[in-house]
Amino acid sequence: MSKVYDWFEERLEIQSIADDITSKYVPPHVNIFYCLGGITFTCFLVQVATGFAMTFYYRPTVAEAFASVQYIMTEVNFGWLIRSIHRWSASMMVLMMILHVFRVYLTGGFKKPRESTWISGVIMAVCTVSFGVTGYSLPWDQIGYWAVKIVTGVPEAIPVVGGPLVELLRGGVGVGQATLTRFYSLHTFVLPLLTAVFMLAHFLMIRKQGISGPL
């Protein structure tokens, strides 16, 4: 085992990277509330893992979506547990994200020179809410259907561009298969990719600038 480690160490200098990570200075004012962002990140990882597991059985069609969710809950081994963890972790992620935003705002973590970190965090907050909106529709039950119909109908009040924007979201005039396909694509590919990119940028900026000082 040591030979394998030495092989990687010689080429990648793993030890120096580990030393840099573990020796990072942590200010004395940091408390448990500074862990809220990390908890949100953990919830995101749980969402990715459980969501990926469900994609093996979920069918994004208006005719089969609801039945496939029922199949996951009743027939797939531990499917009920995986979907329940996905749902609970989603609620926890939203809650921790909100608390994290409040903590950063109340402690002034958005001020110079951390404006970019704050902006990337706000974008991720929007992505998190969008996860909830798109994921809510995927079972394609009565609640999901009418939620999509209401949410996608909101932009219609915008002058000039409202109508085309609604059609873009729905994939047509009414809510149907094209809408479900769009929401499934957003929920399983577009939003996770955007969130991962902005998370990486967020962490790199925190790493570079350090944790903000006390008020």
From Swiss-Prot:
KW Heme (keyword) present: yes
Statement: the UniProt record of this protein carries the keyword Cell cycle: no
Family: Belongs to the cytochrome b family. PetB subfamily.
Transmembrane region(s): 32-52, 90-110, 116-136, 186-206
Binding site for heme b 1: 100, 202
Binding site for heme c: 35
Subunit structure: The 4 large subunits of the cytochrome b6-f complex are cytochrome b6, subunit IV (17 kDa polypeptide, PetD), cytochrome f and the Rieske protein, while the 4 small subunits are PetG, PetL, PetM and PetN. The complex functions as a dimer.
Cofactor dependence: heme b; heme c
Organism: Tetradesmus obliquus (Green alga)
Full protein name: Cytochrome b6
